[in-house]
Amino acid sequence: MSAPMIGMVVLVVVLGLAVLALSYRLWKLRQGGTAGIMRDIPAVGGHGWRHGVIRYRGGEAAFYRLSSLRLWPDRRLSRRGVEIISRRAPRGDEFDIMTDEIVVVELCDSTQDRRVGYEIALDRGALTAFLSWLESRPSPRARRRSM
């Protein structure tokens, strides 16, 4: 085989892997979930928002960004570590990507001794689903009884 032929084979293999990864990601996004917009805080103005899908599974909410090619979730929120800090309406240039029906919730994830802040923008139905999932967590005072 000549060098150009080897280069073409490598290029075809790389493109094939990219298509497989993209297909897998799109398949994961189409499996369902709740539409949401999320960003890490602190953030400046209306910057940093990413559209995606939130999927709930047991004690974890996984956020898949629409524009990401990762095979795993972009953010994971543990139900035991998430605290709601505040709620607000969109403001300023956030209205470019949100409507007045959206509620922005500021969260703090204190899982594993790390303090990470997020903001999630959800419509009223998605907010109800998120709050129901969050409020159904076991009480921190609840202990498993050993026999």
From Swiss-Prot:
Its main location: membrane. The chain crosses the membrane at residues 3-23. One of its GO terms (cellular component) is membrane. Coiled coil: none annotated. InterPro entries: DUF2550 (IPR019675). It is found in: Membrane. The keyword Cell cycle does not apply. To M.leprae ML1147. This is Uncharacterized protein MT1352.
